[in-house]
A protein has these predicted regions:
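N-terminal flexible segment immediately upstream of the FAD-binding catalytic core
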Residues: 1-48, 52-55, 64-95, 247-252, ...
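N-terminal glycine-rich flavin-associated loop
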Residues: 5, 25-58, 75, 81-125, ...
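Short, conserved charged micro-motifs
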Residues: 42-45, 107, 221-225, 272-280, ...
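Residue-level detector of anion-binding/catalytic polar loops
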Residues: 55-56, 118, 236, 292, ...
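Short, ordered loop/turn segments at secondary-structure junctions
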Residues: 62-64, 124, 245, 404
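Conserved glycine-rich FAD pyrophosphate-binding loop
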Residues: 69-76, 81-82, 126, 285-447
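A generic structural motif
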Residues: 95, 259-269, 361-369
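C-terminal substrate-binding/cap subdomain adjacent to the FAD-binding core in PCMH-type
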Residues: 136, 155-316
Length: 447
């Protein structure tokens, strides 16, 4: 088997070393081979071999998100795309770039920044993420407030289907031709429908200036009012991030002397005249809403601050018994959900909840990183997580778990109960992957 793939891929592009196999394990399942293709044709040949030999495939980049998703059933081979790391085409004048999936986000930004352009994606753990992995998980960060998510930034892609067919979804222009945009189908599908082999992104000019206003409050109630006031104004904000005191203390290197129970950060990008007006109005609004402390960060310090936030990985391999939950809520529920989570944490002596929220986008990340291990049994831990999910559900929100111990990674625990549209998802999965080549179990409902 190894000889066959070495002939196809090359001698240093097939691995069965125990150390590397463990690196690409998922939920305790360890592959027997790691394959490192460098072309679309090689991916197609691997698909044919998997179908012929009845093998189950896992698609990965750097496998930095190995703890994301529910437990898989079986795993034979892993395809790592981190050596498909070329920039295929860059049309600078049209603000478009076509890349291979193994290009990392820092590598791409460094290349684009030379021409005063950038890709506005800043997901958690960005320094280790490949673009293919970011698109496959549809992960985003604070910049989604102004620029949107992968679904807004991806113009098209090439995908290798389970039957080895190569398709082109979407296009290379911002205004695509009429028809179904199949690229949206593969974004966020966790590699369960096909192998993303090339991606075309829409780019943006690098902002001339950026400044960040950081305000602290002792009471949370003023913060939703501040966010609503800024949202109702004509002020253009690129990022709006809420952090509670526990998050600041546990995960930030520096609080810059800004003491307080609740922290809100607003980032503004643009030209000097617009920036001056916007920052002054934001400062005034923050004071009117009772801010305890306010500090302004210039471009250099602002960039450093946001890079620190997006580079956080929070949980490493030493703390994989902890949970990272992500919550999406209706606009009107932001304040009440945060208050409910804070009350749940304050009334429970066995856990401490760190909260980071993309406040303008109504996405809340909750980190349960301080379980009292002596008193918190696995069953009780699961019960607490389900209580948190019920709090969210009661306010018309949804919660998924990004990281959990292997004992808690069945689909219902990670994703919650499948929605009304699950039967459509199941039909799509069956239609695209008739022979179940891609590992089953990691996605919603065990897909």
């Amino acid at each position: 088997m190894i000889d066959r793939f070495e002939k196809l891929l090359g001698k240093k592009k097939v691995s069965n070393s125990p150390e590397e196999l463990k690196k690409y394990s998922v939920a305790g399942k360890i592959p027997s081979l790691i394959l490192f293709p460098t072309s679309i044709d090689q991916i197609s040949e691997i698909m044919k071999s998997a179908k012929r030999d009845g093998k189950k495939l896992l698609i990965a980049g750097n496998n930095s998100q190995h703890s994301f998703g529910s437990a898989i059933e079986t795993l034979d081979w892993c395809i790592s795309l981190n050596r498909m790391n070329k920039i295929v085409e860059h049309e600078a004048a049209d603000l478009i770039i076509n890349i291979e999936p193994g290009v990392t986000l820092p590598q791409l930004q460094k290349f684009l920044n030379k021409g005063q352009q950038f890709l506005p994606l800043d997901p958690m753990g960005a320094q280790n993420r490949t673009l293919g992995g970011i698109v496959a998980t549809n992960h985003s960060g604070p910049l989604r407030l102004l620029y949107g998510t992968c679904r807004d930034l991806v113009l098209g892609m090439k995908v290798v289907l389970p039957d080895a067919t190569v398709i082109r979804a979407g296009g290379k222009t911002v205004k695509n031709v009429a028809g179904y945009d199949l690229s949206k189908l593969f974004i966020g599908s966790l590699g369960t429908l096909g192998v993303i082999a090339e991606i075309t992104f829409k780019l943006f000019p690098l902002p001339a200036r950026s400044e960040t206003l950081w305000a602290t409050y002792n009471q949370f109630d003023e913060i939703p009012d501040l966010i609503q006031s800024i949202g109702a104004s004509n002020l253009v904000v690129s990022r709006c991030e809420y952090l509670n005191r526990i998050f600041i203390e546990k995960y930030m290197d520096n609080d810059y002397g800004l003491k307080g129970m609740h922290h809100i950060l607003f980032d503004v990008q643009g030209n000097a005249e617009m920036m001056k007006t916007t920052v002054e109005k934001m400062h005034q609004l923050a004071l009117e809403k009772g801010a305890q402390n306010i500090q302004l960060f210039s471009k250099k310090d602002s960039t450093k601050l946001w890079n620190q936030i997006s580079s956080l990985t929070l949980f490493d391999k030493k703390s994989e018994s902890d949970h990272h939950c992500q919550i999406s809520i209706p606009k009107a529920s932001f304040g009440s959900v945060i208050n409910s989570i804070e009350n749940f944490s304050n009334n429970n002596m066995l856990l401490s909840l760190a909260i980071q929220a993309h406040a303008g986008s109504r996405i809340i990340d909750v980190f349960c990183g301080d379980w009292n291990k002596e008193q918190m049994s696995p069953d009780r831990c699961r019960s607490q997580i389900e209580s948190l999910r019920q709090i969210v559900k009661n306010q018309n929100g949804n919660m998924v778990i990004w990281q959990a111990p292997d004992s808690s990674r069945e689909p219902a625990m990670i994703w919650g109960e499948p929605g009304y549209d699950f039967h459509l998802m199941k039909k799509i999965k069956t239609s695209y992957d008739q022979h179940q080549i891609f590992v089953a179990g990691r996605f919603i409902g065990g897909l």
